[in-house]
Every structure is written in structure tokens, then in C-alpha cells.
Amino acid sequence: MWLGEAIANWTGLTTEGVRQDAPFYTDDDWGLDQNLDWKMDDVIDFVLQDPWLSDDDTDIEYVYLYLMDQHHTALLSSEQIAAGWREHINDWIWVSNRRARDLMELGALPPVTGMGTLNPDYLQIDAQLTTELFGAIAPGMPDAALRLANLPILTTAGGYAAHAAQFYVLLYALASEVDSTQPRREQIVWLVNQARQYIPDTSKTADIADFVLTDYLANPDVNDWERTRDAVYERYHQHASDYGFIYQDWTESSVNFASGLIALLYGEGDFRRTVQIGSLTGWDSDNGTATMGGLLGLLYGYDQLAAAFPDAVLSDRYQSHRTRPTMPDYLPEDSSAEDTFTLMAERILPLVEQTILQAGGIVDGDVWTLPAAASSQPLTLNPLFQLYQQSVNNQILQAGGTLEVNVVGEVAASRTRGIADGLEHNFSGQERTRRLPQAYQRLVTDGELVVSVVYDRTVRVHTIRLIEGSVGGTAIRAEGLMGDDWQPLTDGTVISTSPDPAVPYQVFDIVLPEPVELSGIRVHIESSGRLPEVSVLELDAFFDGAF
């Protein structure tokens, strides 16, 4: 996996960001000397290194591996992720990764760091190139893979960008389930179809996957991958608004997700061809290429990868200190590398076995028996879709209903529109056409801020979620609207975390001892300190049942 990812990453870097718009590359450009002073390798050709240099397509996953190894768990917490980023991920990061890291510097934790209100780059590519590893740690267990990858994905992504990252995680998790007796073309199509089942039909990511796969299957010429790339350019970039979409820029999730799928499908399991196509598709061309190179390495193994380069000796060494100088040196006697892919694989194996055991499987020496596959529909196993389906704000809005937001003492209703817009829990994956709201902020001079959301129907609520930030520290009291009366929700309720004035935004889950029928929720947020300012991103509830 790591070797395939590294070859594809550095080959793709020869073209990264060069063609951000038409005219794009074609097969005829392979071997072209671009004469670009700002590229380490400006000839479009396979790049082989010794040692392999770290880059953001491998080094954030590399840090995650270190954190999992150190904490002896593949299920990292918000605190573990943020601490690891602050210690090891400081430079060589861009777009959403940079935004998330800056928020962490202020004390914010995932998933807040990937929420659109605070991170306007949440629909960029970042999570797609930093989380595939979690799929490899859960072979044949896509539901477990999604659970492990959930917080790492939400660290930098939301909406359909989070779905694209999930899709890649699923490809890696499902690689072990491919029928090796089938032709490679059929194996790849099967993988894409299986991963697609976990993504909601409403998502832009689903639209892209369906569009690319359909065009590939309808194309009589497997070498004419440019046809599909150009169709992607037309639909999601050049005339995106004609199709109800928005093109962000060359580092966005969407066109680069499409490029990765084009390389995977038209490459038909051939490593060299897959990397060639990925490198020539355009936009941020190293990212999806690296993902698919790693996938084929995982799927077909080292011997097949080595056979693709019969005249080369493929290095096993990895120089992590190029971009991550605070990481451990596992090769103190090697002056130019700090790790090897072999050692990295050895650190992954215990995590794989732990994941299998925790999922109910069996580990007997070198034999792994995976747990029985979940009988549920794949989409229902997606933790992001589960969150969206249980969000009262989102489901009422999706059903065409109404929500009434009130902040005591606030006369400008436009300032409160983001409090119950559902953005922080909206994982339908639909294109967002409205401008992102700002967090509601208020200097609380009378001791407390009172915020309510009233529904147009009664809902069976089991949890109230407040995403809030306060300079001076807070105390929170919750109430529910029962009939015409607001009733306190105190007996037996548990708040998931304690207010911390050092954390700019926190997620508070107020868990009720049992579900309660409510037609509204209200919170009293008490703030203290020299500057008692309170910020509110979202006030939502999670429900049992269906609308």
C-alpha cells in the first residue's frame, strides 16, 4: 500500500496544479518535458526515489499511524487527534488542513475543526488524501472502517467532501473482498459499486460516482479516458451551474474525486496505466493518483507492484523528516531515512488484528476470521448519514417544515439564521447554494443567553446538542417544550463534556435518561468572566422514530 501510494504520489506531483483548466493533458503528453522550474521532476513520467520523500499524500496518514500505535487503538479521540496535529503537523499543509490546524492552535477539537461555519474550506480535497489508511486497518469490515475514519474525516471535511473521503476509505476496506478469480476490470467495477452503496443518493459525491461509472461503461474505447475527464469538466467545472453544482477551485473535493475514479476505472487494475491516467487528468493530480496507487498496491501486493517496474529496485525507505521533522527516527543509523514501509506494515498489523477482534472476529496466528457482515442496508451503517437522519433540524427542513429560532433580547433575526440551519449535521451531501452563516455571537451582560428552537411538530428527542463557544466559561441548562409549557430537563440528564474556557468551540450533548416528546428545545447559557461573550453554531436535537 505505502509503496504504491508513494510511486503514484510522486509521479502525480509532476503535473499537480499545472493544468487547472482546459486545455488539459492527454495521453500524448506522457513523457513531456514541461520545463517548470518549480517542479522537482518536470518530465511527465514515473518517478522512483530512494528514499521515498514524505508529502501530504502520505505524511498525515503516517502521523495517524504513529498516534494509533502510541495509543494502542485505531479509534482515535478528538483530543488525541488534535494533540497529534499540534505536535507533528505544522507545515506543508494547505487549504482545509491549514484551517483545521489553525483552529487547533486556538484550542478547537475535531469535529469542530471541519465545520463549515468555522472552516470555509471544508469542501476541499483534504480528507480524501489523509484517511484511506483507516480502510486498510479494517479489511472486509466497511462499517468498522467508517467508524474508525469518522473523526479523522470530520477533522477537515463536511458535506459531500466527507462522503468522498468515506468512498476512498471504503475502497481500501473492501479490497480484501474482491473475487480474485474475476478479470481485473470486473474487480474494479465491483469495488466502485460496493463503495457507492454506503453514500446517500442525495450527495454530490454519489452523483459523481454514478456519472463517471456510467460514462466509463458506455465508452467503447478503454483508452479514451479523456472523454470522461472532459465530460467531468463540462458538468462539474466549466458549466457546473447549469447542472445545479458549484465549482470551487482546483483543490476542491469534487473534480479531484472524479479524477481518482477515472484513473481507477480506466486503469482496470493495471498499476502503471492507472498512475499514468491519474497524473494526466489535471487539477490536483497527485492526490487521487496516490490514493489509487495505494489501493492497487493493497489489492494486488508487492510482487505485482515490483513486476510493473522490472528494471528497477524499489526502495523500502521513507524520509518522514522532510515534512514531519518531529516524528520518531526508526532508523537512527540511516542518515537519509527515518522509517521503512516494512516497519510501517509491522506497526499496522496489531491494529488490524485489534479491529477484527473488537468487531467480533477471530485471530488465530496468521489466520483471520472476519465477523459476519452486517445484515443492515449499507447506507444505514454510514455514521455521517445516521447523524443526518437523526438531526431534528435537518429532517424537519428536509420535509418542508419550519423551525422558529429565538434568542431573548435579539432583534435582528438575520443574525440567528445559522443557529438551526442544520449545517453542522447536514450530511445529505447536497450542493450548498446559500452563503455560509457566521456563528451567532453575543456579549452577555445580564448573566445568561437564552436560545430556543420551536418545531412545527412533536418529535421524540433523546439528545440535545449545543455547539457553542464562550470566552469566560459556561453553565448550561436545557428545557423542552411540552404542550405550551417549557419544562426543565434536569433529572437524570448527562452532559457529554464540561465547559472549558480554553476551548473556543465545544460540542455539548445533553443526553436524556429516556426519549421525551417535545415540540421545541431551549437552553440557558450562563457565561462569566471579564468579557462574557457567547457564540452559538447550532442548537439541534436527535430523535427516535421517523417523520
Q: Which residues are covered by each model-predicted region?
A:
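Catalytic phosphate/nucleotide-handling subdomain of diverse soluble enzymes
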Residues: 7, 11, 18, 22-29, ...
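Active-site-surrounding "flap" and adjacent substrate/cofactor-binding loops of secreted or lumenal enzymes
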Residues: 13-48, 58-61, 82
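Extracytoplasmic mature domains of secreted/periplasmic and thylakoid-lumen proteins
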Residues: 70-125
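Accessory "access/gating" subregions that flank catalytic or transport cores
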Residues: 105-106, 110-122, 131-141, 150-155, ...
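Acidic, carboxylate-rich catalytic segments that either coordinate divalent cations
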Residues: 206, 214-240, 245-246, 299-393
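Predominantly extracellular/luminal regions of secreted and cell-surface proteins
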Residues: 390-430
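Aromatic, loop-rich ligand-recognition surfaces of beta-strand-rich domains
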Residues: 432-490, 504-547
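Solvent-exposed serine/threonine-rich low-complexity stretches and specific carbohydrate-binding patches
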Residues: 488-499
